[in-house]
């Protein structure tokens, strides 16, 4: 992991901490309430973020080993995973979100330099180098945190993310959130006390790296 990749990984850590701080105080009614994404509750958004981390970890492992390990078995399996996760309790869903984020981070931090250049793909997308997974994960966390509708908005984005140069699909998605922000009024969910930190330096059992 070079300096630029480590900086991206650090930004993902910080974005994940902000997300988990909010996830920890979401109540059952809050979780079942609609998100800002049509047809999805807040639980769906959090489940999507957890499964997204697993999918990107799969691709990092594929880049490292050379063995086929698809992000998702199929589009249907992806959707089914989100639906299953959305039915979990707030505590279980937050744990799932934190565990999947930690597992992705661990594999990314240990990835050999040459593996970052290996082409990977998500379902039927065009191949792209594995190093782009870091940017994709950061964008996914920041944008979907806004989609929760808990008060986090583009105005809360760190300057580095707001100014980051992105390829067109991700750039357009970020612009969409900026355009929609003015019309969205959502109450901020605040932790009732200082939240316990998400510890990105915690070591995971080795079996988590390749079997979750």
Kindly label every feature range from the protein language model.
Residues 46-75:
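Conserved alpha-helical segments that form or flank metal/cofactor-binding pockets of metalloenzymes
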Residues 78-100:
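A short, structured beta-strand-centered segment in the mid-to-C-terminal lobe
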Residues 14, 37-40, 44-51, 136-139:
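Aromatic- and histidine-enriched alpha-helix N-cap/loop-to-helix transition segments
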Residues 9, 13, 46, 50, ...:
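Short amphipathic alpha-helical segments with heptad-repeat character
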Residues 16-20, 24, 53-57, 98-112, ...:
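Structural signal for well-ordered, non-membrane alpha-helices
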Residues 1-21:
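Short, extreme N-terminal leader segments that mark the start of a protein/domain
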Residues 21-41, 110-126:
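Helix-loop segments that flank and shape redox-cofactor active sites
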Residues 1-7, 61-71, 95, 110-212:
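Structured surface interface patches that mediate subunit assembly and partner/cofactor docking
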């Amino acid at each position: 992991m070079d300096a630029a990749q480590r900086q991206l990984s650090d930004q993902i850590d910080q974005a994940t901490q902000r997300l988990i701080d909010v996830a920890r105080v979401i109540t059952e009614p809050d979780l079942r309430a609609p998100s800002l994404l049509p047809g999805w509750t807040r639980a769906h958004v959090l489940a999507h973020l957890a499964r997204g981390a697993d999918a990107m970890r799969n691709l990092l492992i594929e880049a490292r080993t050379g063995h086929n390990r698809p992000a998702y078995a199929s589009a249907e399996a992806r959707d089914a995973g989100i639906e299953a996760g959305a039915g979990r309790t707030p505590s279980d869903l937050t744990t799932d979100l934190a565990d999947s984020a930690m597992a992705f981070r661990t594999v990314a931090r240990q990835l050999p330099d040459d593996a970052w250049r290996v082409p990977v793909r998500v379902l039927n997308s065009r191949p792209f180098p594995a190093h782009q997974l870091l940017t994709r994960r950061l964008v996914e966390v920041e944008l979907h945190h806004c989609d929760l509708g808990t008060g986090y908005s583009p105005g809360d984005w760190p300057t580095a993310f707001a100014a980051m140069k992105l390829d067109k699909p991700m750039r357009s998605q970020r612009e969409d959130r900026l355009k929609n922000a003015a019309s969205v009024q959502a109450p901020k969910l605040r932790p009732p006390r200082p939240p316990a930190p998400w510890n990105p330096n915690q070591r995971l059992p080795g079996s988590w790296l390749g079997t979750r």
